[in-house]
Amino acid sequence: MPHTHRRVLSAAAVAALVALTGCSSDLPADGAGSGSASDAGKGADGQNKTGDQSSFFVQADYEAQLAMRIKQPTGPADKPWEQAIDPQPVDTARYKKAGPYRLCFSNAATNNPWRQVGWKTMQAEVAQHKEIADFTVLDAEGKDDKQISDIAELQAKGCDALIVSPNTTATLTPAVKGACPKVPVILFDRGVGTDCPVTFIKPIGGYAFGADGAEFLTRKVKHGGKILALRISPGVDVLETRWSAAKRIFDNNKLDVIGVEFTDGDAAKTKSIVSNYIQRHGTIDGLWLDSGATAVAAVEAFEDAGLPVPPLNGEDQQDFLQKWKDANLTAIAPTYPTYQWRTPVIAALKILKGESVPKVWNLPQPPITAENLDTYLKPGMPPLHYALCGCEKMDGYPQKWGGK
């Protein structure tokens, strides 16, 4: 290990696998987005069959994210975790200090496969930097109150920089805001309601993810085709924006959204929902999902019924990519790259060396297509591994990520 001392106060036992990726869960007071939307259809005219737009929807953010998908990022071509789209640099000279450094990390959780892959990748990034003398980590285990306490505790540990992945947006805002005057804060994955962190690191975002899948279906499904939309749960910001983007696209195209159902990220429930819709409608022409973790279960519902699998979107989990390849699916995999877990460590060191960083560090978020599927399909990696980890050249790969 290149750093002289590394103490992880809590790495949290792996909780039950859930299908949320980089999500926060502050439900709006009006409950917008709650409940099943399977009865949202408003007749054969195709108008607003997807129900009301989420209260999370912000038109300007939607437009900005869709535009960023085609912008050329700056940074090393072979290191997308160091690239940035439309970077607006901030001066960090006031934080410059001599090393070695003590970095601290308040992690929301390691309670799903996406976060587990990211956490392994972050640890490997830390191990590459001999100037990191100590890496102190507290895992909030998906609990807001614990993370608030964790952030306060870390401020008393003599951290040179504090990395935060907040469990939820609004609830963690005061804790992050309170830390900013005391230590440079690097925020990533999920946002909070203050711009006081030195930098906020994230992929393009939920609108881009949702649009990639929905636009694919508008190209692959005939006019009037029946679309089933599968969501995990309401009130989760990045999932709400994924659906908001898809809803906008479906509402503006001649596709028949026959149902919008919540699966709770459960494979068995997903399979049951899809099977019920097959029995009820006979034909489903396209599947849209706000997270790919249950995509294989949805595919299996068609296979069990002896029906061809319609066009659909998944995500960059290996089980879906392998099913796509083996079954020759018509598919796309929007991504929320786990390589973003490398970037906060890099950003913290740049800040402590007085180097500028983007105020909002927008990382590229490339979809996986039929043309590049083979590039991301990794033989020997476990089913729940995420392909866009940016970890292939790191020490310990593939074994530390569960591969062979």
Where are these regions (language model features)?
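C-terminal motif of bacterial Sec signal peptides marking the signal peptidase cleavage site
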Residues: 18-22
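Bacterial lipoprotein signal-peptidase II cleavage site
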Residues: 23-36
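Hinge/cleft segment of the Venus flytrap/periplasmic-binding protein
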Residues: 41-101, 341-404
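Extracytoplasmic "Venus flytrap"
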Residues: 41-95, 100-121, 125, 129, ...
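Flexible loop/hinge segments that line or gate small-molecule binding clefts
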Residues: 64, 169-208, 318-330
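Hydrophobic alpha-helical segments within soluble ligand-binding/sensing domains
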Residues: 90, 147, 201-227, 241, ...
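An alpha-beta-alpha
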Residues: 103, 122-124, 211-260, 348-351, ...
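Hydrophobic alpha-helical
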Residues: 164-179, 246, 263-323
